[in-house]
């Protein structure tokens, strides 16, 4: 089969980037200017309107047609060249795309950067690019000039000059088109680009068919959203102008808003969501409060989202086509660069679908009852996609697929067992976040309430791929909790997932070994799912259990740039943020790529099965599959069963999910959701009337236990508590969360953390250092030695709190060391700090105890210099 490389140049009044290839191609003004083509390694030829149809395009069945971006060329062929110039339709199976092949090998999509990455010569002719812009679109409209026009040339001379300039532009355009064909041919045949696997080639063809099919846009709803947004923006802008006396006239004037806020003593460098919320949380003056509140309301871009969807919808049938890009990410996941359908907000607020009617009616009052109207509209924007008349959308998506895949790859059996139990019973008590919270906090799952569940959720989302404090804050938006508290939660998550933590190390080690030795490396032996690392001298590949490989071009092993004694990292080149630059990855990041790639392959197999059954897949988003079917022809259970059908390569992987259907892509919620956690909590776990504010009570009883204020001198704090506190309930909750039996250091001493030796000499030094600190600790526990780094006069102390429950009185005894005259109150830590070695009057010969209330709880010993 011969290969035809071709590139087409067109003219249109329609904007290609703003409307997409399909709307551009069907526009009445769109026409072909010329196209160039080459047969195999032959000479590049040019076709222009009026020329006969080339033979290879008249009989396309026996040829393969390769273009750089086949979305554009296929649309121009179907809607321009075939109906107007007599070209023969080319079967979809005979098309191929050089850009998709490059993306599948983790190389850039843009031609110039791709040639740079593939070491191919490429010359960007700025004159030819300018000529292409002049010929491909009408000249920009100019404002009428106020200057007096002076006639310098006669019309005939101007016409001749225009014709000469146009002829010169066509010459430059032809040269540019020929250069594009040569570049496409060289890139497509580059030895650095490995061909697609047969199943991936089949997926590429299915992707083109799904993009051609498209999904319907809900035009009335989108138009109503635009009108609603315009009214809200107008009201916000009017108020801003009134407040600032015309200084700020629009909520989009970010520099002016920052200037106005900073003039009142603030130091805002950005107006991002977190920055604005942080300033508002500190209760600024009324002017700052109102102006930032208006900015927060006006920051929602729901109006722009609706306009973008309308612009990409076909004027013929309102369907959005070409919205999905195959290999939008290096892991193989799809993206939606044009209309950005993957960026549509979920209905996280669980708003009723009845509010869609309120948007259609422009009912601001009803919308305002559920929050800011712009925010409500943003949460409902998935209603902008709908089914065709007489059809429904059946949407099925995997549940916690990344957590499931990670546990399956690493062999975290307790988690896999929990997923299987949840899939069988559908008991919300067994939800993954509750199970993780129970494992992290070492409590019974029946005692997991909403705060503990949120901790489990945050840990699962932030720590699954090795994330630490930064990842936790980024995912949760928590900027107030101390680092030590968050690190305590992170350590608990890692302690509950020892095999996942081990898997990060195995993957990083296998990748480094493959690069260093050039030999195939298995991450884990059978029967674990097979993940292999290989290196061909230039690119590292990680082969997934499905058989597909993720590529890391120009990979090499480099020292860690984050930790002095950390493991080496893998450096490779990536098209990050549109730039071909070097980036780094370690074991956790590589595991994230493997997990996302495996989840993507699960979705790919589901798409193939659905299309094989004759179902019409119209859209898919990350882990979700959307099928359009005539009403009553297909059930939700059938689609969900197909999605959860495990492929042969994923044996033992528990899959779960949910499904909903209706005329809209938005999930229907007829009534406010029930608080499942509150319903399933047992009566014995409900807070008592005297202990409704857990955080406040904890801070009152145990200073700094929940990030509270600095502890005060107990001698000066003799005033009785005016707020009744259920101390027994407090102790019970602290025991459930694993907070008892941990004391803070009461003086400074060095921490060595995860110190690692890079040489035998350094190893001996570390051993001596650790032995020295362990020896100091043993002597300190028995009261015979004071740590040499302790601040003079800051001795240790233990505080005994006791309560006489029969008499209803409380007493507190304070014991100080011989080196200080000022007692220091004892502290309880929520973050798992190690014991400080304080002398404790309740200590006996068998164990060290610290009394809290009427009971004494043992304090476990920890090795100095190691994380608890």
How does the language model describe each region?
Residues 1-9, 14, 106, 117, ...:
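Conserved "right-hand" nucleotidyltransferase catalytic core of DNA-directed polymerases
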Residues 3-4, 15-19, 23-190, 395, ...:
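Conserved DEDDh/DEDDy metal-dependent 3′-5′ exonuclease domain
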Residues 193-199, 602-625:
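Active-site palm subdomain of RNA-directed nucleic acid polymerases
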Residues 428-451, 564-613:
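Generic long, charged, amphipathic alpha-helical segments
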Residues 562-569, 665-744:
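Acidic, low-complexity intrinsically disordered tails
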Residues 737, 746-751, 760-774, 778-784, ...:
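Compositionally biased, intrinsically disordered low-complexity segments enriched in Pro/Arg/Gln/His
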Residues 753, 774, 783-786, 790, ...:
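Short hydrophobic alpha-helical segments enriched in small aliphatic residues
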Residues 800-809, 814-824, 828-830, 834, ...:
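Short, low-complexity segments with poor structural confidence in diverse proteins
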């Amino acid at each position: 089969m011969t290969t035809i490389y071709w590139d087409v140049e067109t003219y249109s009044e329609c904007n290609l980037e703003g409307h997409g290839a399909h709307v551009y191609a069907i526009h009445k003004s769109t026409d072909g200017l010329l196209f160039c083509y080459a047969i195999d390694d032959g000479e590049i030829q040019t076709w222009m309107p009026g020329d006969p149809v080339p033979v290879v395009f008249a009989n396309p069945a026996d040829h393969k047609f390769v273009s750089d971006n086949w979305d554009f060329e296929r649309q121009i062929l179907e809607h321009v060249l075939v109906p107007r110039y007599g070209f023969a339709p080319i079967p979809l199976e005979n098309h191929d795309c050089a850009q998709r092949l490059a993306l599948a090998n983790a190389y850039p999509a843009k031609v110039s950067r791709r040639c740079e990455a593939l070491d191919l010569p490429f010359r960007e002719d700025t004159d030819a690019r300018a000529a292409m812009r002049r010929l491909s679109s009408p000249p920009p409209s100019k404002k009428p000039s106020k200057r007096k026009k002076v006639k310098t040339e006669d019309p005939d001379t101007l016409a001749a000059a225009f014709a000469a300039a146009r002829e010169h532009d066509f010459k430059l355009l032809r040269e540019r088109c020929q250069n594009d064909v040569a570049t496409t041919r060289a890139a497509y045949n580059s030895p650095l680009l490995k061909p697609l696997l047969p199943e991936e080639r089949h997926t590429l063809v299915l992707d083109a068919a799904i993009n051609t099919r498209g999904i319907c846009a809900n035009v009335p709803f989108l138009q109503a959203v635009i009108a609603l947004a315009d009214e809200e923006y107008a009201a916000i802008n009017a108020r801003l102008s009134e407040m600032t006396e015309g200084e700020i006239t629009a909520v989009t004037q970010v520099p002016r808003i920052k200037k106005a806020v900073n003039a009142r003593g603030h130091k805002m460098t950005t107006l991002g969501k977190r920055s604005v919320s942080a300033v508002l949380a500190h209760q600024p003056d009324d002017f700052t409060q109102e102006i930032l509140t208006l900015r927060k309301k006006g920051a929602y871009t729901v109006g722009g989202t609706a306009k973008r969807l309308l612009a990409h919808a076909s004027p013929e049938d309102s369907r959005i086509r070409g919205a999905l890009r195959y290999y939008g990410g290096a892991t193989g996941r799809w993206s939606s660069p044009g209309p950005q359908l993957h960026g549509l907000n979920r209905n996280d607020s669980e708003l009723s679908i009845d509010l869609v009617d309120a948007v259609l009616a422009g009912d601001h009052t009803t919308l305002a009852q559920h929050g800011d109207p712009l925010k409500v509209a943003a949460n409902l924007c998935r209603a902008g996609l709908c089914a065709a008349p007489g059809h429904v959308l059946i949407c099925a998506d995997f549940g916690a697929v990344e957590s499931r895949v990670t546990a399956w790859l690493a062999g975290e059996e307790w988690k896999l067992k929990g997923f299987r139990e949840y899939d069988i019973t559908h008991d919300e008590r067994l939800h993954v976040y509750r199970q993780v919270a129970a494992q992290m906090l070492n409590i019974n799952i029946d005692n997991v309430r909403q705060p503990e569940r949120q901790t489990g959720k945050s840990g699962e989302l932030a720590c699954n791929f090795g994330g630490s404090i930064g990842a936790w804050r980024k995912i949760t938006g928590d900027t107030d909790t101390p680092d030590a508290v968050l690190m305590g939660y992170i350590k608990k998550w890692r302690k509950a997932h020892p095999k996942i933590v081990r898997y990060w190390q195995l993957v990083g080690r296998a990748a480094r070994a493959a690069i260093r030795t050039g030999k195939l490396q298995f991450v884990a032996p059978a029967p674990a799912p097979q993940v292999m690392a290989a290196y061909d001298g230039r690119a590292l590949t990680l082969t997934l259990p499905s058989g597909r490989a993720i590529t890391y071009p120009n990979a090499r092993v480099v020292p860690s740039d984050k930790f002095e004694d950390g493991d080496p990292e893998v450096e490779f080149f990536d098209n990050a943020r549109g730039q071909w630059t070097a980036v780094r990855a370690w074991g956790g990041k590589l595991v994230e790529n493997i997990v996302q790639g495996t989840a993507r392959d699960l979705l790919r197999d589901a798409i193939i099965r659905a299309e094989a059954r004759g179902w019409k897949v119209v859209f898919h988003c990350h882990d979700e599959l959307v099928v359009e079917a005539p009403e009553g022809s297909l059930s939700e259970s059938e689609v969900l069963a197909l999605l959860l059908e495990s492929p042969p390569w994923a044996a033992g992987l528990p899959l779960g999910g949910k499904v909903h259907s209706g005329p809209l892509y938005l999930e229907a919620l007829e009534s406010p959701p029930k608080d499942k956690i509150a319903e399933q909590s047992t009566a014995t776990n409900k807070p008592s009337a005297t202990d409704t504010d857990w955080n406040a009570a904890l801070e009152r009883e145990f200073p700094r236990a929940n990030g509270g204020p600095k502890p005060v001198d107990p001698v000066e704090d003799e005033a009785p508590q005016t707020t009744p506190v259920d101390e027994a309930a407090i102790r019970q909750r602290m025991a459930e969360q694993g907070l008892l039996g941990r004391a803070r250091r009461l003086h400074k001493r060095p921490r060595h953390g995860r110190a690692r030796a890079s040489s035998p000499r350094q190893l001996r030094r570390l051993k001596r250092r650790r032995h020295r600190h362990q020896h100091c600790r043993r002597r300190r526990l028995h009261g015979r030695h004071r740590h040499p780094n302790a601040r003079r006069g800051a001795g240790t102390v233990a505080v005994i709190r006791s309560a006489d429950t029969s008499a209803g009185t409380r007493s507190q005894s304070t014991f100080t060391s011989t080196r200080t005259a000022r007692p220091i109150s004892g502290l309880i830590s929520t973050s798992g700090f190690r014991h400080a070695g304080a002398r404790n009057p309740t200590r006996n010969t068998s164990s060290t105890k610290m009394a809290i209330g009427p009971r004494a709880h043992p304090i476990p010993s920890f090795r100095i210099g190691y994380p608890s």
